[in-house]
């Protein structure tokens, strides 16, 4: 259904990542990393279903609309825990939503409205995206291993 959407709408670009490995242990090649960075830098908007990529999007101040539409859910969400709207209640997702830096749509009407709002005003919710950057990214600057070791050391010797 996503391919059909992309094939029938010129403005929709569907990117399917080229990964190496299996579902539990995969990585992106250099070309895929370049493509992903280009998408983040040059896109007008990201539409996703609560992907962690919304954190990277915040680094580029890229507006994000998440969708949780039961009408297009592949699973029987009434008898399983795969309710697309249930994802919004997961702690790691709700913390992102609480920043006000992204939008979530539970109906097609909301989806269209949020998309149009961001296309009309890309700066909308920019302050919230800055909060995502500050709260979820951190200052690693190439010394993440050292900071991790220092933290473990502090736990052991305090």
Language-model segment annotations:
Residues 1-4, 10, 20, 41, ...:
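Context-gated lysine
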Residues 2-55, 59-60:
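Donor nucleotide-activated moiety binding/catalytic core segment of transferases
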Residues 2-5, 118, 155:
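Hydrophobic helix-cap positions at the C-terminus of alpha-helices
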Residues 34, 109, 142-146:
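A structural signal for well-ordered alpha-helical segments within the folded catalytic domains
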Residues 52-139:
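Catalytic binding pocket for nucleotide-activated donors in carbohydrate/polymer assembly enzymes
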Residues 141-158:
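C-terminal alpha-helical cap of glycosyltransferases
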